[in-house]
């Protein structure tokens, strides 16, 4: 699985990265592992998966985490994840 993550502010990409996880875990575990790696790389706290976020990710393999998804204040508009490749 490859996931592309990017931080967006004022319609511009501030940071982006692609993280891969081709382990034997379930899809859900891989996604959570990748989210942890991305947050570590971007020096962010882990976002909260709201019901709407989960539904968007299930439907489109893509989701956005805005200020409502983070406990800490953020200096960007949103963080977006998109699955580029599945196992």
Regions found by a protein language model. Give the residues of each.
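Acidic, low-complexity intrinsically disordered segments
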Residues: 34-87
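Solvent-exposed strand-loop boundary residues in beta-sheet-rich modules
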Residues: 9-11
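Short, flexible N-terminal segments of the mature chain
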Residues: 13-41
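Amphipathic beta-strand/beta-sheet edge segments enriched in Tyr/Trp
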Residues: 3-6
């Amino acid at each position: 699985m490859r996931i592309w993550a990017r931080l967006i502010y004022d319609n511009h990409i501030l940071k982006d990265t692609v993280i891969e996880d081709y382990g034997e875990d379930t899809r859900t575990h891989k996604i959570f592992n990748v989210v942890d790696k991305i947050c570590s790389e971007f020096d962010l706290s882990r976002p909260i998966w709201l019901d709407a976020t989960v539904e968007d990710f299930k439907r489109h393999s893509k989701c956005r985490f805005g200020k409502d998804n983070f406990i800490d204040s953020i200096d960007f508009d949103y963080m977006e994840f998109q699955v580029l490749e599945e196992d």
